[in-house]
Amino acid sequence: MADLFLDKILVKNNRDQDELDTEREIWERLENRVILLFFAKSRSSQCQEFAPLLKDFFVRLTDEFYVDRSSQLALVYVSLDQSEEEQERFLKDMPKRWLFVPFKDEEFRRNLEAQFSVSRVPVLVVLKPSGHVISFNAVDEVVRLGPPCFKNWQEVSEIIDRSFLLPEFTDDRAGRSMTDPIRRIKYKDETTNEKKKRKHCDDEDEGGGGGTEFF
């Protein structure tokens, strides 16, 4: 998935509009997640109708007010608006966890539009973490099924279930349990003891002591 955004910039839809401008930052936000590419324009009546539904869909899957842990889902908004002001008005009421392609990067926005054959809006492309397409337009699916359709995408994507990890957007080290070192030491001790026991039994066998037989 990172290849799609290689050498590109994505922006967080937060107050400061923080930029993800390194491959590592983008990879950490998108890897092992179902990716939604949302193509829309603020002046479209159909987009205006669908946007609140998509917002609710996304929030119910990622906001811990509704779920114990955020689903492995990311959304990148690709604006087809006529101006940056229109884009900003559209995104103003959308979730802060959304990402978007900078309006000034028109070439990249147009390339995505062509790559996914976007001829009308709204369009919601669903991608596996690998970048392979699950659906070229899941708008109707989201409208009809709501959040349950994410489970289908998740199964098709074969993403790793990280429900056992600490909160999302942490690096691999932060995702490890605090008890990992203890468990590793314990496992090592147990393995050492097993070797000692096996050696002791082998010594008894050699000496005719009839030690325990291992299979």
UniProtKB/Swiss-Prot annotation:
Belongs to the nucleoredoxin family. It comes from Xenopus laevis (African clawed frog). Coiled coil: none annotated. The keyword Heme does not apply. Residues 185-215 are annotated as: Disordered. Gene3D superfamilies: Glutaredoxin (3.40.30.10). It holds the Pfam family Thioredoxin_8. This is Nucleoredoxin-like protein 1.
